[in-house]
Design a protein with these regions (language model features):
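Extracellular glycoside hydrolase catalytic/binding regions
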Residues: 41-42, 126, 133, 137-142, ...
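The conserved SAM/SAH-binding core of class I Rossmann-like methyltransferase domains
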Residues: 62, 259, 293
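Active-site mouth of glycoside hydrolases
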Residues: 15-200, 211, 287-288
Length: 343
């Protein structure tokens, strides 16, 4: 698995520090496939990227729409959209942060579920082969296979994930791959048989010849873990979920990445957020890191989880995130970028 550096005040003795701590910059996943750039969707501005880099964050999860990048399954990537994505990656890397590429499609291409025609596993693998070629072995670029597959059986999703990983490796890309589970890839349900087997059992079948992968999970703090409520009745469950996921990762010698999590500015929510951050910070042997949901220029100012800078004032959630960062890690050449596997 990707090596981490054993530095940083947040790590317990013998535990590496978290290298990858950042945010999702939402915007490129907005709208439908026919959306107009600059009108219906955007990519991050340098001002926003610079803000989070200056805080000491080390990774940006970058959502985008599969259909816009590849308008026809099995065909070439759209040159204009690929350039926008590539330019955004270059901008983020310019400011010293890693990038997690995130096709934000919930396990679908248009209305076709991954694994079924027309979005077959072969089509999914073809997409990843084409995208992987563009970013193969670039330091600072990791591949998130898919955002939140939710209604695919775990056993079926495993086949899709393995097909994509196989395609990525066949084209010679050694980049870190982050693999979600099904059922929204929830940390709290990871070991529960919700749909076609538990992620925590089925996804142990992931096959990567380079063994350069981790599992991406998501966890929200509201009553139903959906990330759609301002209150946080599920805060205790969220804290327990991350603790449980930590145990599972250690027992199975795996690495995890918390790709989405968010809370409102309510005091109890922020307190729970800090507990989750501490759990991960204390267990760098299990966690690669995290990316908070979310920020982005077009996020409504009143959106409860929003940490986009406004009027030069930091929201309480952002203060908690900043407190979890270690400037020594951000400055470390070993932690500033996702390195391709060398084996």
């Amino acid at each position: 698995m990707l090596p981490l550096v054993a530095t940083g005040h947040a790590a317990v003795a013998g535990s590496p520090a978290l290298c990858y701590q950042g945010v999702n910059l939402s915007g490129a996943e907005y709208g439908d496939r026919n959306g107009v750039y600059g009108t219906n969707y955007i990519y991050p501005s340098e001002r926003t990227v610079l803000h989070f880099a200056a805080k000491g964050m080390t990774i940006i999860r970058l959502p985008f729409r599969w259909e816009r990048l590849q308008p026809r399954l099995g065909a070439a990537l759209d040159a204009n959209e690929l350039k926008r994505l590539s330019d955004s990656v270059a901008l983020i890397r310019k400011h010293g942060m890693a990038v997690l590429l995130d096709p934000h499609n919930f396990g679908y291409y248009d209305k076709g579920q991954v694994g079924k025609a027309p979005a077959t596993n072969a089509a999914f693998a073809d997409f990843w082969a084409r995208l992987a070629v563009e970013f193969a072995n670039r330091e600072g670029v990791a591949f998130g296979l898919m955002n939140e597959p939710y209604d695919i059986k775990a056993t079926d999703w495993l086949k899709s994930a393995n097909a994509a990983i196989r395609a990525i490796r066949i084209v010679g890309a050694r980049n870190l791959v982050l693999v979600p589970g099904t059922v929204w890839s929830g940390a709290g349900s990871w070991e529960k048989d919700v749909l076609g087997g538990a992620n925590g059992t089925v996804m142990l079948g992931v096959k990567d010849p380079l063994d350069n992968y981790g599992f991406e999970v998501h966890q929200y703090f509201d009553v139903d873990s959906s990330g759609t409520h301002e209150s946080c009745e599920g805060a205790d469950n969220a804290v327990k979920a991350i603790a449980g996921m930590t145990t599972w990762l250690k027992q199975n010698n795996k690495r995890g990445f918390l790709g989405e999590f968010g809370v409102s500015s309510e005091e109890a929510c922020v307190e729970a957020l800090s507990k989750v951050l501490k759990t991960m910070g204390d267990n760098g042997d299990a966690w690669l890191g995290w990316s908070y949901w979310a920020a982005g220029e077009w996020w409504p100012p009143g959106e409860a989880y929003n940490v986009q800078p406004q009027n030069r004032r930091e929201r309480p959630q952002a203060v908690a995130l900043n407190a979890a960062l270690d400037p020594k890690v951000a400055a470390s050449s070993d932690c500033a970028m996702v390195k391709p596997a060398t084996n």
